[in-house]
């Protein structure tokens, strides 16, 4: 059984499962903060891409944060030396004090990963998910010991964004939660606490905001550009809702809202937008495809 003494252990070894944009970013900030990192992915090519991206990002940051050439070189070398890779999840988590799942947003995939993790990790390891849309209780459905499970929701790009949402379910122990807060601070993030609820804090406010903006445009209340301009100049937002949705990806925004609408059909705020549905069906997903609410093709 997971105990208070176990939870308050010193975290030294961190395993990150999933080497995509989020996983590689989490690996970078964790390693640069002095932790040993094992980055795991069943796809060897994905691991190679992740390590290349991390190296480039660390090198870029060293030029901004460090003074002399030696300080820059030492920072890059030391950070990269702390990151190891593995394409076997069971092996990767065997010695980890903290495990962060950062796979794609597929509930069955995440549950399968945690079933494998729980069978292979230490009894006192802390297990976390970086999910941005699923409830912790849904991700942890098959876990035997839910007291050592919590949420660490980083934001993209991880090396740049300062916020970390730390989430607890009804089963998360106080000791586990305190350790996660401590870890978040140790990797240089400002932590905010949230209970297990749809979208946590940021996405729970942000995603419906996108869709309300889309509905305003669909009703003919205002143009996209005027809505964006109004929120930038009137509310002090760095980007308007349409610009930000294009930046995040319309497929991602739609995926989150569709999931909430299915789970909470009585909540009108979660209703779909015909405009968003049309753009996604046409493959116009935002900046990453060159077209979304706006066109980014040169």
UniProtKB/Swiss-Prot annotation:
InterPro entries: 3-OHacyl-CoA_DH (IPR022694), 3-OHacyl-CoA_DH_CS (IPR006180), 3-OHacyl-CoA_DH_NAD-bd (IPR006176), 3HC_DH_C (IPR006108), 6-PGluconate_DH-like_C_sf (IPR008927), 6PGD_dom2 (IPR013328), Mito_3-hydroxyacyl-CoA_DH (IPR052242), NAD(P)-bd_dom_sf (IPR036291)
One Gene Ontology term, aspect cellular component: mitochondrial matrix
Annotated site residue numbers, Important for catalytic activity: 153
Organism: Caenorhabditis elegans
The protein, known as: Probable 3-hydroxyacyl-CoA dehydrogenase F54C8.1
Lineage of the species this protein comes from: Eukaryota, Metazoa, Ecdysozoa, Nematoda, Chromadorea
Main location as per UniProt: mitochondrion
Family membership: Belongs to the 3-hydroxyacyl-CoA dehydrogenase family.
Catalytic activity: a (3S)-3-hydroxyacyl-CoA + NAD(+) = a 3-oxoacyl-CoA + NADH + H(+)
One term of GO molecular function: NAD+ binding
Alphabetically ordered keywords of this record: Fatty acid metabolism, Lipid metabolism, Mitochondrion, NAD, Oxidoreductase
Source species, domain of life: Eukaryota
GO biological process, one term: fatty acid beta-oxidation
E.C. code: 1.1.1.35
Subunit structure: Homodimer.
Pathway annotation: Lipid metabolism; fatty acid beta-oxidation
Subcellular location: Mitochondrion matrix
């Amino acid at each position: 059984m997971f105990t208070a003494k176990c939870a308050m252990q010193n975290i030294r070894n961190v395993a990150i499962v999933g080497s995509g944009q989020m996983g590689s970013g989490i690996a970078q900030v964790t390693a640069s903060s002095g932790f040993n990192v094992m980055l795991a992915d069943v796809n060897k090519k994905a691991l190679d891409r992740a390590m290349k991206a991390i190296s480039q990002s660390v090198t870029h940051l060293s030029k901004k944060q460090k003074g002399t050439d030696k300080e820059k070189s030492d920072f890059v070398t030391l950070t990269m030396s702390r990151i190891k890779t593995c394409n076997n999840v069971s092996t990767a988590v065997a010695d980890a004090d903290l495990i962060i799942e950062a796979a794609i947003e597929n509930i069955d995939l995440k549950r399968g990963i945690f079933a494998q993790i729980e069978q292979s990790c230490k009894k006192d390891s802390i297990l976390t998910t970086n999910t941005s849309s699923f409830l912790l209780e849904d991700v942890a459905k098959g876990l035997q010991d839910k007291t050592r499970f919590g949420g660490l929701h980083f934001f993209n790009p991880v090396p740049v964004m300062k916020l970390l949402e730390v989430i607890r379910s009804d089963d998360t122990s106080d000791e586990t939660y305190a350790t996660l807060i401590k870890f978040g601070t140790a990797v240089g993030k400002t932590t905010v606490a949230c209970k297990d609820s749809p979208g946590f804090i940021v996405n729970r406010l942000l995603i419906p905001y996108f869709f309300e903006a889309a509905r305003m445009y669909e009703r003919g209340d205002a143009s996209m550009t005027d809505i964006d301009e109004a929120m930038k100049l009137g509310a002090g937002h760095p980007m308007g809702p349409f610009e930000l949705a294009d930046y995040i990806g319309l497929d991602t925004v739609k995926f989150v809202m569709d999931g909430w609408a299915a789970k909470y059909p009585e909540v009108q705020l979660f209703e779909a937008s015909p405009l968003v549905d049309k753009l996604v069906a046409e493959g116009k997903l935002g900046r990453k495809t060159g077209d979304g609410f706006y066109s980014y093709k040169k």
